[in-house]
Amino acid sequence: MKEKDLYKRFVNETPKILHHRIENFIGVGFPDDVLYINNKFYTCELKCTDHNKIKISPFQISFAMQHPIGHYFLIGHKKEVKLFESKSIDDLLKEGFKAKNPIANNWKDIRDYLYKL
């Protein structure tokens, strides 16, 4: 799975959310997707991996640590998907996709969680 495919699937799976894809030239470490949900903005970093390890840049780590609320990581691994809060950054770095604290680990639960924000 590639990041662009994960983004397309994310948009298709969450039709009630307005997504704004951010290109890399905006700012180093700024998240890939700005979400507009129930009149509020949130950010989401999209990551894909074929292995357990997740590649997260130092700038993305810094952003996650500075924004512990309202920032998420959507991780695609082969045919699986998980959503994590940014405050889980340490676990993601240590445990990768197998981190034990996702908010949701399938599209239905991701959609249900985000729609309630």
Predicted regions, residues:
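Short glycine/proline-enriched coil/turn segments at helix->beta-strand junctions
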Residues: 14-17, 38-39, 67-70
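Short amphipathic alpha-helical segments and helix-helix/interface helices
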Residues: 7-11, 60-65
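Acidic-basic catalytic patches of nuclease active cores, encompassing PD-(D/E)XK
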Residues: 1-24
